[in-house]
C-alpha cells in the first residue's frame, strides 16, 4: 500500500530517501531550505532535494521558517499520512509534528542516542567508532530525542572517511525508511525509548 507522504530534507544525504519514497509511495510535496546564492555571479543554487523534486514535478515548499503560520496551514491542507524528515535543517514546531496520523519520522545518521544533533557522520569517524548506522525515530520537540523505531548498522573500514561513510549511510537510510514505513502501516512498529 502506498502512503501519502510529505518529504522534508535538504542536502545530498536526503536524496536517496526521497527517491525511495517516490518509487514506493506517493510524495505529495517536498519541503526544503531556501535556495542559496553561490559564487560571485550570485546565481541561485537549488538544494539537492529540490532538484530531485523538480525532476518529478513534485510541488516544492521553501519556507524561511518552518513555524510560519501560512506554511503550517498549507501542510494541514495537504494532510499527509506521514512526514519523513532527513537532514532538513530546521526544528519543527509541535503544530507540524501533530499533523500526520503516523507522525513525523526522522532518518538520522547515527545509532541513537549516540551522536544526536549535527554532524553525526563526521563525529563517528573522528572518534574512531568501529560501527555506526542509521536510526529511524518519531520526532518530538527535543533535538533527536524521540522514540526509536528501527536501526541498521554499518562497520567502518580502516580507511573510512566522512565522505565514504556518508555515501554508505545515505543508501542504508533509504532502505531502513521503507522498512519502517511498512511496520508503521502493519502496526508492527515498536517504540523504543532512548536510554541516555
PLM region spans:
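N-terminal Rossmann-like dinucleotide-binding module
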Residues: 2-41
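Short alpha-helical
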Residues: 12-13, 70, 91, 143
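Donor/substrate-binding cores of folate-linked one-carbon enzymes
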Residues: 82, 86-196
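Amphipathic, non-transmembrane alpha-helical secondary structure
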Residues: 15, 19-22, 72-76, 94, ...
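Positions that flank functional sites
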Residues: 36, 68, 140
Amino acid at each position: 500500500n502506498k502512503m501519502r507522504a510529505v518529504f522534508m530534507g535538504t542536502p545530498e544525504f536526503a536524496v536517496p530517501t526521497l527517491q525511495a519514497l517516490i518509487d514506493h509511495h506517493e510524495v505529495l510535496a517536498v519541503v526544503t531550505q531556501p535556495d542559496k546564492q553561490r559564487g560571485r555571479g550570485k546565481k541561485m543554487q537549488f538544494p539537492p532535494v529540490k532538484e530531485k523534486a523538480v525532476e518529478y514535478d513534485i510541488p516544492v515548499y521553501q519556507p524561511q521558517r518552518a513555524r510560519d503560520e501560512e506554511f503550517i496551514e498549507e501542510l494541514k491542507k495537504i494532510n499527509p499520512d506521514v512526514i519523513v524528515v532527513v537532514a532538513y535543517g530546521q526544528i519543527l514546531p509541535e503544530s507540524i509534528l501533530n499533523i500526520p496520523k503516523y507522525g513525523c519520522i526522522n532518518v538520522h545518521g547515527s545509532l541513537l542516542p549516540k551522536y544526536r544533533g549535527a554532524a553525526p557522520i563526521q563525529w563517528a569517524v573522528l572518534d574512531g567508532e568501529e560501527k555506526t548506522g542509521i536510526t529511524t525515530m518519531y520526532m518530538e520537540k527535543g533535538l533527536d530525542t524521540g522514540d526509536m523505531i528501527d536501526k541498521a548498522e554499518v562497520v567502518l573500514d580502516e580507511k573510512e572517511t566522512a565522505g565514504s561513510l556518508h555515501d554508505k549511510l545515505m543508501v542504508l537510510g533509504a532502505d531502513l525508511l521503507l522498512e519502517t514505513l511498512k511496520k508503521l502501516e502493519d502496526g508492527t512498529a515498536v517504540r523504543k525509548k532512548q536510554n541516555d
